[in-house]
């Protein structure tokens, strides 16, 4: 940092916007990127997921409007689904980017940048659950199924929900603990976190919670119809299961067949964004 210390923030910013090289140690990258973000939104591309995660933590210390867009842990054609918390981060970032008034810094590994995703998830509004809100419980269950949640007898994993009388348990992908929703008629009376181990509530939730989809392929009526039509042409176990409203492991591998519009993360960035490549391993 010794070469940077005599410079003011303005001088550093001017240097970053000039055609001259600015030599600086890796430890200063986060600070320099945050300065650059004062002028325009940035897409910072890293070599690996670990590098993206580490750099995002550092940049967030200087620039609060920092988002992560992680890559799937799986390859596109593997019969495995990406983890629900990865999906939640990706969807949350894409929805945050709809606010074009802020100078976002998006950190993404190169695999995430070149991977086309289902653009339908951008405009899928989260379900807001809060005390006093009213829902038809049957309709809410349908919405959760369309968000690719699985109904079970007991909620133990992210992406599951269960219903017992006027109580709905759900484990959103971006939460550390599942949530118990107590209904009085159609009105939400109470919200609490509960433990998976003993299924007992341990903390009341004071504010509303946004329920995001837990998969990037949403099992809508349109998707089920497409899967059913394709299943008549191609013998495929995944297509058969999707057409019946099931959520098979690895169903995301069929997104290119079932979804008409696929996009890159660059399409969701503000128009004046700038890319920064930090591809050192």
Please state what every model-predicted region is.
Residues 1-281:
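ASCE RecA-like P-loop NTPase motor cores
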């Amino acid at each position: 940092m010794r070469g940077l210390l005599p410079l003011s923030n303005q001088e550093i910013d001017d240097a970053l916007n000039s055609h001259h090289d600015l030599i600086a140690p890796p430890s200063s990258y986060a600070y320099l990127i945050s300065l650059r973000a004062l002028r325009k939104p940035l897409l910072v591309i890293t070599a690996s997921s670990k590098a993206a995660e580490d750099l995002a933590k550092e940049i967030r210390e200087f620039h609060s409007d920092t988002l992560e867009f992680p890559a799937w842990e799986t390859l596109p054609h593997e019969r495995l689904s990406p983890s629900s918390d990865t999906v939640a981060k990706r969807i949350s970032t894409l929805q945050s980017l709809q606010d074009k008034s802020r100078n976002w810094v998006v950190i993404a590994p190169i695999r995430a940048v070149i991977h086309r995703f289902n653009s339908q998830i951008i405009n899928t509004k989260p379900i807001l659950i809060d005390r006093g809100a009213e829902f038809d419980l049957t309709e809410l269950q349908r919405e959760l199924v369309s968000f690719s949640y699985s109904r079970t007898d007991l909620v133990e994993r992210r992406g599951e929900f269960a219903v017992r009388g006027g109580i709905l348990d759900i484990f959103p992908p971006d939460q550390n603990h599942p949530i118990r929703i107590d209904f009085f008629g159609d009105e939400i009376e109470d919200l609490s976190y509960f433990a998976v181990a003993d299924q007992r509530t341990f903390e009341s939730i004071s504010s509303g919670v946004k329920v995001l989809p837990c998969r990037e392929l949403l099992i809508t009526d349109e998707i089920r119809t497409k899967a059913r039509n394709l299943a008549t042409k191609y013998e495929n176990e995944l297509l058969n299961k999707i057409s019946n409203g099931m959520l098979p492991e690895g169903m995301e591998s069929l997104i290119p067949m079932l979804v008409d519009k696929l996009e890159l993360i660059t399409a969701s960035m503000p128009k004046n964004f700038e890319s920064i490549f930090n591809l050192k391993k």
